[in-house]
């Protein structure tokens, strides 16, 4: 049994979110939740919500046993980039890129 959860346009850059995703890839679900709970990174809280959603999907939709689940796949890709303007000296302006990411989590029974 496998179950997925997706989050699109999360307000964190994909590069920063991948650092956290690499820590839980292939781990047992309980271990992954523990790692994310005690991590100080902003991405950990976002990925924890997606992981909990995938666990709930597996339990409610598939009838899976939570103790048998592990993180089979986690992907973090670049989402859309919001372009903003910052005023600079002498009437100039610079572009600010606010990056987003798409997070995909698949949990599966071993």
From Swiss-Prot:
InterPro entries: Ribosomal_uL22, Ribosomal_uL22_bac/chlpt-type, Ribosomal_uL22_bac/org-type, Ribosomal_uL22_CS, Ribosomal_uL22_sf. The gene is rplV. This is Large ribosomal subunit protein uL22. SUPFAM superfamilies: Ribosomal protein L22. Pfam families: Ribosomal_L22. Gene3D superfamilies: Ribosomal protein L22/L17. Transmembrane segments: none annotated. It comes from the Bacteria. Coiled coil: none annotated. Belongs to the universal ribosomal protein uL22 family. GO terms for biological process: translation. The keyword Nucleus does not apply. This protein binds specifically to 23S rRNA; its binding is stimulated by other ribosomal proteins, e.g. L4, L17, and L20. It is important during the early stages of 50S assembly. It makes multiple contacts with different domains of the 23S rRNA in the assembled 50S subunit and ribosome. One of its GO terms (cellular component) is cytosolic large ribosomal subunit. HAMAP family: Ribosomal_uL22_B. One of its GO terms (molecular function) is structural constituent of ribosome. Keywords: Ribonucleoprotein, Ribosomal protein, RNA-binding, rRNA-binding. The keyword Nucleotide-binding does not apply. NCBIfam families: rplV_bact (TIGR01044). Part of the 50S ribosomal subunit.
């Amino acid at each position: 049994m496998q179950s997925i959860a997706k989050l699109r346009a999360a307000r964190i850059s994909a590069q920063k979110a991948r650092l956290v995703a690499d820590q839980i890839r292939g781990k047992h679900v309980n271990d992954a939740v523990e790692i994310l709970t005690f991590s100080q990174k902003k991405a950990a809280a976002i990925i924890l919500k997606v992981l909990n959603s995938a666990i709930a999907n597996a339990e409610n939709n598939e009838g899976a046993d939570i103790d048998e689940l592990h993180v089979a796949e986690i992907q973090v890709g670049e989402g859309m980039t919001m372009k903003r303007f910052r005023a600079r000296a002498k009437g100039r302006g610079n572009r600010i890129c606010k990056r987003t990411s798409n997070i995909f989590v698949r949990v599966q029974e071993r």
